[in-house]
Amino acid sequence: MKIIHYIPSIDRTSGGTTAYMQLLANELGKLVELNIVSHVSNNPVNIGNCQVHYIPTFNQYRKMKRQWLFLLNEINPDIVHINCCWMPGCALTQKWSQELNYKIVLTPHGMLEPWIIKRHYWTRKIPALLLYQKNAIIKANYLHATANSEKENLLKIGYNKNIEIIANGIEIEKITLKTSWKRRKKILFLSRIHVKKGINFLIESIALLKNDLKDYVINIAGEGDENYINELKQLTIQLGIANYIHFIGGVYGEQKWKLFKEADLFILPTHS
């Protein structure tokens, strides 16, 4: 079996979708002939058990289309799997594939959750829905949800009822249990730094509880837009808790698991 996965970015700063593609390829690539198609970025991750192809972005429409069609012709996949929504490249690769009668699976990765749709609703989401995104959802052969809650929200949208739930996997072989449960007074947030993650809620909550958290260290780990990170840092200063919170940037591999083991509490506030 041959499968093409299209994903707009496999850069490490893209967070969960990049990690998903890495973990998926580790196992799926053992079972099928797997090809991943994406675009050039500054810090692409290494993905094993597959062939990675880079094509031009939407800004080079003709070149992008030509190279995508070339790959379809060369690989002749049984399934084309589109990852993510709202970016024109996702809808275009789907459209070009379906014009040649390829079967499409669309994985929104939470990008059709209510909070995401409401964000920039009139300026971005409505134009995208009218131009391409609604049609892409309707015409996909299957939508892939990762949880029942996501499926329920996709059904509420009402564009496509062919939805299958497949949870995201995690590689557990290299994860070891904590050797000590001694309290270290460390709280951890670890994810992509993005407004949808609700980090401001965490910061505001810490400000309310700062008298009870005097000896605690709150680590906020992850990469994201520098302007937004600076906004969050400024918020900690305004609330008088800058000395409680440490922004430590992106962490990966063993360093990530080390932070989890050292933390007494992991917090992931989110809008979706």
Feature-to-residue mapping (PLM):
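Nucleotide-activated donor-binding/catalytic signature segment of Leloir-type glycosyltransferases, i.e.
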Residues: 230-251
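Membrane-proximal helix-turn-helix segments that form the acceptor-binding/catalytic region
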Residues: 99, 112, 125-143, 157
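N-terminal subdomain of nucleotide-sugar transferases
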Residues: 1-43, 48-50, 253
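Carbohydrate-associated surface elements
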Residues: 40, 149, 169
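Aromatic "clamp/platform" in nucleotide-sugar-dependent glycosyltransferases that forms part
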Residues: 271-272
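Short alpha-helical donor nucleotide-sugar binding micro-motif in glycosyltransferases
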Residues: 250-251, 258-263
